[in-house]
């Protein structure tokens, strides 16, 4: 059984086809339909999968609750999917909520006291828990107890309530914002990495099969190459390319058709869209390749600092188009080449690394 409280996401760019956050409730429902149910069906993240397989097997063998799990990494990489898989593999219920929803200690206490033995509580955006709610969570994680206040004023007293053993699965895109006391209470900590094109091609092929969409291996790989290492983006691009194939062709997704559809969507050969190119072009042209501070860059392109740091930058840095240095952001030689420009300094990438 899965019960879901209303989730409140961070600021989004919902009109971006390559956004790593769900654009609508309809898209979230689409994602659920494609979500793998078991660990064996989950593609990629081999190290994390291997660890979870061992830990879950051991917990089942001892008939214990799985240790608390912290999943962190960029959005769209499968943190929510893994939480659902953990609950299914352990044969228990899952309760799902998010940090911003838990405004008062009573909100969390109500969830915890309704958990059955070994159930999974999934808290997305756990870094956004309020301090007062987080304090309630500490004894729950360590001792399976919570302290609640009965009464008010001088007559108020603290009462301990015992909880059933449970597993907390926390997910965050900003692990650095977690407090040390909270982070230290997770026995299993796993970072999710961007996917390779081959892994994403396997995900696209599986999703196409579930959607009854005909696709050849080259078509799946072309979509994967432009999906920014993110399964959520790969599945969204697949939906749009499928529409294009049904209208402009016989419905079969080939490499040529995928290329034409993605060019129409303004997604270039490395997965950049208009916003990505706008950011890189600002660094290249307005700030002479950098270094430039993130606040100046945010003002130049009209986006929030958090959007740049959480949404736009990670993929560019991981792919080697942008560098963070003590003096600010710098475009690499790869960024100049992508726009057909000559780097104004010899060894520019090496120079940036030394700053």
UniProtKB/Swiss-Prot annotation:
InterPro entries: AAA+_ATPase, AAA_lid_4, DNA_helicase_Holl-junc_RuvB, P-loop_NTPase, RuvB-like_N, RuvB_C, WH-like_DNA-bd_sf, WH_DNA-bd_sf. Residues 269-355 are annotated as: Head domain (RuvB-H). It is found in: Cytoplasm. SMART domains: AAA. Keywords: ATP-binding, Cytoplasm, DNA damage, DNA recombination, DNA repair, DNA-binding, Hydrolase, Nucleotide-binding. One of its GO terms (biological process) is DNA recombination. Residues 196-266 are annotated as: Small ATPAse domain (RuvB-S). It comes from the Bacteria. One of its GO terms (cellular component) is Holliday junction resolvase complex. ATP binds at residues 34-35, 76, 79-81, 142-144, 185, 195, 232. Residues 4-195 are annotated as: Large ATPase domain (RuvB-L). Its EC number is 3.6.4.-. Pfam families: AAA_lid_4, RuvB_C, RuvB_N. GO terms for molecular function: ATP binding; ATP hydrolysis activity; four-way junction DNA binding; four-way junction helicase activity. It catalyses: ATP + H2O = ADP + phosphate + H(+). DNA binds at residues 305, 324, 329. Has 3 domains, the large (RuvB-L) and small ATPase (RuvB-S) domains and the C-terminal head (RuvB-H) domain. The head domain binds DNA, while the ATPase domains jointly bind ATP, ADP or are empty depending on the state of the subunit in the translocation cycle. During a single DNA translocation step the structure of each domain remains the same, but their relative positions change. Belongs to the RuvB family. PANTHER family: HOLLIDAY JUNCTION BRANCH MIGRATION COMPLEX SUBUNIT RUVB (PTHR42848:SF1), PTHR42848. The RuvA-RuvB-RuvC complex processes Holliday junction (HJ) DNA during genetic recombination and DNA repair, while the RuvA-RuvB complex plays an important role in the rescue of blocked DNA replication forks via replication fork reversal (RFR). RuvA specifically binds to HJ cruciform DNA, conferring on it an open structure. The RuvB hexamer acts as an ATP-dependent pump, pulling dsDNA into and through the RuvAB complex. RuvB forms 2 homohexamers on either side of HJ DNA bound by 1 or 2 RuvA tetramers; 4 subunits per hexamer contact DNA at a time. Homohexamer. Forms an RuvA(8)-RuvB(12)-Holliday junction (HJ) complex. HJ DNA is sandwiched between 2 RuvA tetramers; dsDNA enters through RuvA and exits via RuvB. An RuvB hexamer assembles on each DNA strand where it exits the tetramer. Each RuvB hexamer is contacted by two RuvA subunits (via domain III) on 2 adjacent RuvB subunits; this complex drives branch migration. In the full resolvosome a probable DNA-RuvA(4)-RuvB(12)-RuvC(2) complex forms which resolves the HJ. This is Holliday junction branch migration complex subunit RuvB.
């Amino acid at each position: 059984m899965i019960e879901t409280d209303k989730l409140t996401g961070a600021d989004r760019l919902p009109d971006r086809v390559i956004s790593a956050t769900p654009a609508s409730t309809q898209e979230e429902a689409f994602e659920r339909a494609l979500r793998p149910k078991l660990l064996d069906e989950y593609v990629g993240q081999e190290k994390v999968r291997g660890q979870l397989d061992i830990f879950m097997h051991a917990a089942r063998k001892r008939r214990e609750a799985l240790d608390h799990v912290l999943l962190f990494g960029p959005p769209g990489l499968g943190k929510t999917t893994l939480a659902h898989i953990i609950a299914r593999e352990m044969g228990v219920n899952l309760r799902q909520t998010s940090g911003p929803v838990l405004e008062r200690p009573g909100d969390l206490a109500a969830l915890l006291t309704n958990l059955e033995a070994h159930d999974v509580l999934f808290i997305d955006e756990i870094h956004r828990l309020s301090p007062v709610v987080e304090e309630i969570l500490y004894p729950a994680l360590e001792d399976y107890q919570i302290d609640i206040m009965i009464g008010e004023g001088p007559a108020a007293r603290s009462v301990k309530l015992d909880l059933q053993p449970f597993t907390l699965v926390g997910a965050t895109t900003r692990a650095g914002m977690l407090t040390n006391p909270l982070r230290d209470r997770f026995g299993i900590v796993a970072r999710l990495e961007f996917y390779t094109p081959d892994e994403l091609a396997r995900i696209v092929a599986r999703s196409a099969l579930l959607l009854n969409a005909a696709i050849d291996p080259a078509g799946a790989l072309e979509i994967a190459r432009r999906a920014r290492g993110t399964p959520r983006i790969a599945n969204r691009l697949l939906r749009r390319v499928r529409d294009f194939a049904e209208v402009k062709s016989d419905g079969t997704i080939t490499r040529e058709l995928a290329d034409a559809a993605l060019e129409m969507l303004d997604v270039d050969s490395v997965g950049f869209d208009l916003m990505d190119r706008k950011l890189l072009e600002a660094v290249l042209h307005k700030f002479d390749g950098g270094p430039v501070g993130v606040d100046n860059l945010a003002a130049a392109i009209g986006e929030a600092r958090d959007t740049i740091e959480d949404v736009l930058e990670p993929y560019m840095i991981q792919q080697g188009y942008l560098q963070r240095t003590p003096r600010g952001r710098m475009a690499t030689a790869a960024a100049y080449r992508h726009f057909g420009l000559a780097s104004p300094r010899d060894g520019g990438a090496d120079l940036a690394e030394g700053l």
